[in-house]
Regions:
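Glycine-centered secondary-structure boundary/capping sites
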Residues: 51-56, 103
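Amphipathic alpha-helical scaffolding segments comprising HEAT/armadillo-like alpha-solenoid repeats
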Residues: 1-11, 37-49, 70-82, 104-115, ...
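Alpha-solenoid helical repeat scaffolds
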Residues: 36-37, 48-49, 61-71, 77-80, ...
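Structural detector for internal amphipathic alpha-helices that build alpha-solenoid repeat scaffolds
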Residues: 19-38, 58-70, 90-102, 124-136
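Long, helix-rich interaction regions
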Residues: 1-23, 91, 115-171
Length: 171
């Protein structure tokens, strides 16, 4: 599927969802996922340009969140979109797909590079993004009878067929 066409269908479907006060993601993302064979160089450049556009960047975050993997060429632009996102509660939309596909150390290295070489606003953005760019360790106490055991685990990402998206869970 063509990226520009997919975006146009996405926007139309998203507008319909909002108009009807429905929650969910546009179905075109699932269709794209089923037909996805990889991105061309043109697709990658288009997605990079979309990440610099305040409206189109959300499409890229949603699209990559639906794919099993995506090229390393999109990692830094995705993280940069998280850094420049003014609302810290939304920058995870760009980081979550990266966490699922790439190593935490690689993500943190890129963010630290942006911090070292960035402007004051970029440095503030990196500090906000680092909140999401870390392995999450969970500790769970299980009470069974008179016995208390503690379990620890990390985030694990898996495709949820019912929700048609990747979700993370405790493992």
């Amino acid at each position: 599927m063509d990226i520009q066409h997919t975006f146009e269908v996405y926007r139309t479907q998203l507008d319909n969802l909002r108009r009807h006060n429905s929650y969910g993601r546009p179905q075109v993302l699932n269709q794209f996922r089923m037909q996805f064979k990889g991105f061309s160089e043109t697709d990658i450049e288009t997605l990079k340009a979309f990440l610099l556009d305040d409206d189109k960047k959300w499409f890229v975050a949603d699209l990559l969140d639906h794919l099993r993997e995506f090229p390393r060429d999109l990692l830094r632009p995705m993280l940069y979109s998280a850094v420049i996102e003014p609302d810290a509660s939304f920058n995870n939309e760009f980081i979550k797909p990266c966490r699922r596909v790439f190593d935490f150390a690689e993500i943190q290295k890129i963010l630290l590079d942006i911090f070292q070489n960035g402007s004051k606003d970029e440095k503030i953005g990196v500090l906000k993004a680092l909140y999401w760019a870390r392995p999450t360790v969970y500790s769970l106490q299980v009470h069974s009878g008179g016995k208390v055991t503690e379990q620890q685990g990390y985030d694990v990402f898996g495709w949820d067929d019912e929700l048609k998206s990747y979700n993370y869970d405790f493992n």
